[in-house]
Amino acid sequence: MEDLSDVFDIYAICACCKVAPTSEGTKNEPFSPRTFRGLGNKGTLPWKCNSVDMKYFSSVTTYVDESKYEKLKWKRERYLRMEASQGGGDNTSGGDNTHGGDNADKLQNVVVMGRSSWESIPKQYKPLPNRINVVLSKTLTKEDVKEKVFIIDSIDDLLLLLKKLKYYKCFIIGGAQVYRECLSRNLIKQIYFTRINGAYPCDVFFPEFDESQFRVTSVSEVYNSKGTTLDFLVYSKVGGGVDGGASNGSTATALRRTAMRSTAMRRNVAPRTAAPPMGPHSRANGERAPPRARARRTTPRQRKTTSCTSALTTKWGRKTRSTCKILKFTTASRLMQHPEYQYLGIIYDIIMNGNKQGDRTGVGVMSNFGYMMKFNLSEYFPLLTTKKLFLRGIIEELLWFIRGETNGNTLLNKNVRIWEANGTREFLDNRKLFHREVNDLGPIYGFQWRHFGAEYTNMHDNYEDKGVDQLKNVIHLIKNEPTSRRIILCAWNVKDLDQMALPPCHILCQFYVFDGKLSCIMYQRSCDLGLGVPFNIASYSIFTHMIAQVCNLQPAQFIHILGNAHVYNNHVDSLKVQLNRIPYPFPTLKLNPEVKNIEDFTISDFTIENYVHHDKITMEMAA
């Protein structure tokens, strides 16, 4: 039996927000794909105008590729011939319809909407331009509508209409009842799904659908519209072989492709850039981009790397083949532009292709050398969403660094146990710090930031005006010499390494000012992918926001360079769970605008809005 969604290329496109809680009891509901389900409220969109989503909607529903039409036409005509030969094919539509424009001359997409959706469109935008508008209503007549559109009264009439029209694709654009009927009748090939990361009152909701019948095949970059983050998913029908890339190949395709980009970067091969998903011509649904949006061509060396990794024919490939039997990732995306996949792709690459090594802790690791991640702080706050992170602990530790503190008890008294294992008597004795008091961590990060070169005695002494205050110098340079190439903060003091409970992992960062914006690049020599790196991404992103504010700048980018990147053997099973999860849109970070001195920030000055996340994943720290 033919799949009509594929024959007639019927898609759904929608934008959904989080639903504002209506009672105290609903505030702590766990997050899930159904978190984003709000479609409308009182006859209009729940949110105010979201320009990014509107551009995306317009781009998706107006884009056509003339070169592919003949193939689509042949497919539809073949179906109609087969239908006719079987005695079917009643092509008489029951609807009373009209249409504006000569469909035969210009290839366009069809947009199908219910009456309420049609009436919610502002008058100046009716009918939606450069699209064949179809309104589904049992009560609307052509006398009720001044604009020239098709009016039909059932989904069956829509199928009859599509048999007659010359069109590229058909998009169901709302409302909830139309979505529900098309999904229940298996008439949707793909769902273009915008996740608006804000909570609003809603009275209309996107219908539930069988997620075993659809899988996520694309996750876009994270964008920001007037302070609200959003991203774009594509759900593809399982086994449909659709444009978004649902295929019957390996279920590890998604992360393998991301890992290939990570591997290419480790091998000094430039990774392909991703065009923003502003329409179906982007990588968001697998079609070739027009020239100005197309990613740059790969180098011969990169093509070789990609080919070898895909075919599993290299030395690493043979290792991957056997490992794949263990790694049963459910994610089947081909096109993953969400920034969190940089992190997930590195983990996947290390698990599949890493070198097995012993390590200081005795646990053992798989490791690789040299990765890079970039995060756009002007759009979002990169707090990982595939597991819940201890944000309060991240902020308290950063403030502790900024104050130049080395007393682990300060954090423990706030129930922040990040450094607890490194301050025990046993750990300090193993470091030959027999004279050191428990939880005296020595001249670690904060001491080097604020007192570089000073003689360290113990955690109780006063070091005011001793050593070099690197943080103060960094802020001074940003304010007074913003083009300086010496705006560097370094925690790696060779003379003090033996006195530290733990030598610094993130050892150096540099700041860059351009066009009123501040970027930070950080080099991390030792990178615990399971536990440490998620904290480091968030911490240095917050740090960049703080320094930008006190210097009257806007945050731009955080760039994370990873040296020895490793996965502990006792973290692998937990990380497999994390790799199965689809990221949510990142949250946003707001600082108290009244704070102008870096030392004046307190925990109450930080607000994280719309942090949607998966459940916590427990991993034991290797100390």
UniProtKB/Swiss-Prot annotation:
Keywords: Methyltransferase, Multifunctional enzyme, NADP, Nucleotide biosynthesis, One-carbon metabolism, Oxidoreductase, Repeat, Transferase
Residues that hold substrate according to the record: I13, C14, D53, I173, Y179, T194
Domain DHFR: 9-237
GO molecular function ontology, one term from the record: dihydrofolate reductase activity
Binding, NADP(+): 15, 38-44, 115-117, 137-139, 153, 174-181
Gene3D superfamilies: Dihydrofolate Reductase, subunit A, Thymidylate synthase/dCMP hydroxymethylase domain
Catalytic residue positions: C505
Region feature 3 X 4 AA repeats of G-G-D-N, mapped onto this chain: 88-103
EC number: 1.5.1.3, 2.1.1.45
Biological or metabolic pathway of the protein: Cofactor biosynthesis; tetrahydrofolate biosynthesis; 5,6,7,8-tetrahydrofolate from 7,8-dihydrofolate: step 1/1
Any one annotated GO CC term: mitochondrion
Function: Bifunctional enzyme. Involved in de novo dTMP biosynthesis. Key enzyme in folate metabolism. Catalyzes an essential reaction for de novo glycine and purine synthesis, DNA precursor synthesis, and for the conversion of dUMP to dTMP.
Family, as annotated: In the N-terminal section; belongs to the dihydrofolate reductase family. In the C-terminal section; belongs to the thymidylate synthase family.
Domain notes: The repeat region is missing in the pyrimethamine-resistant isolates BUR-98 and BUR-151.
Subunit structure, as described in the record: Homodimer.
Protein name: Bifunctional dihydrofolate reductase-thymidylate synthase
